[in-house]
């Protein structure tokens, strides 16, 4: 409980500072998705120099990660698709996820959903290697 009290929100990052740093090269937000190793994550390296620990994201997921964006679980080193994080987005109202999908035409939205389900099923089956 004492450790939880010492945690602060991780630094903002990404376009319009609408995301939060999850690690030195990971920036995620509900409306943004996740950036890994891009210019949007450069600011996140500064977290290593701050004296107090931080925590970003929602519910715990995966191996030491937290829900970072709808359907995505990130630790400080990596991100993966996580169906439980889709459920969390729905519990919060799901507005950002739905808003992002409505901007796509029907075929692009269907393709994205099929790709997310394929990746989630492959992960549950312990599949290794590329998705496609």
Curated annotation (Swiss-Prot):
Primary subcellular site in the record, as a coarse category: secreted
Disulfide bonds: 10-54, 13-27, 21-44, 28-34, 61-73, 67-85, 74-79
Keyword Iron-sulfur part of the UniProt annotation: no
UniProt-listed SMART domains: NH
UniProt keyword Cell membrane present: no
Domain of life (superkingdom): Eukaryota
TM helices/strands, residue ranges: none
Alphabetical keyword list: Cleavage on pair of basic residues, Disulfide bond, Secreted
Location relative to the cell: Secreted
GO cellular component: extracellular space; secretory granule
GO molecular function: neurohypophyseal hormone activity
Role, per record: Neurophysin 2 specifically binds vasopressin.
Database matches in PANTHER family: NEUROPHYSIN, VASOTOCIN-NEUROPHYSIN VT
Protein family: Belongs to the vasopressin/oxytocin family.
Protein name: Neurophysin 2
Organism field: Struthio camelus
């Amino acid at each position: 409980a004492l450790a939880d009290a010492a945690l602060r929100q991780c630094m903002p990052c990404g376009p319009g500072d609408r995301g939060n740093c999850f690690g030195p090269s990971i920036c995620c937000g509900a409306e943004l998705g996740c950036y890994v190793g891009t210019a949007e994550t450069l600011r996140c390296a500064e977290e290593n120099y701050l004296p107090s620990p931080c925590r970003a994201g929602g519910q715990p997921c995966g191996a030491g990660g937290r829900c970072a964006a709808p359907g995505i679980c990130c630790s400080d080193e990596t991100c993966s698709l996580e169906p439980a994080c889709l459920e969390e987005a729905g519990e919060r109202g799901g507005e950002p996820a739905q808003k992002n999908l409505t901007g796509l035409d029907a075929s692009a939205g269907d393709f994205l959903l099929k790709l997310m389900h394929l990746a989630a099923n492959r992960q549950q089956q312990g599949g290794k290697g590329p998705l496609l």
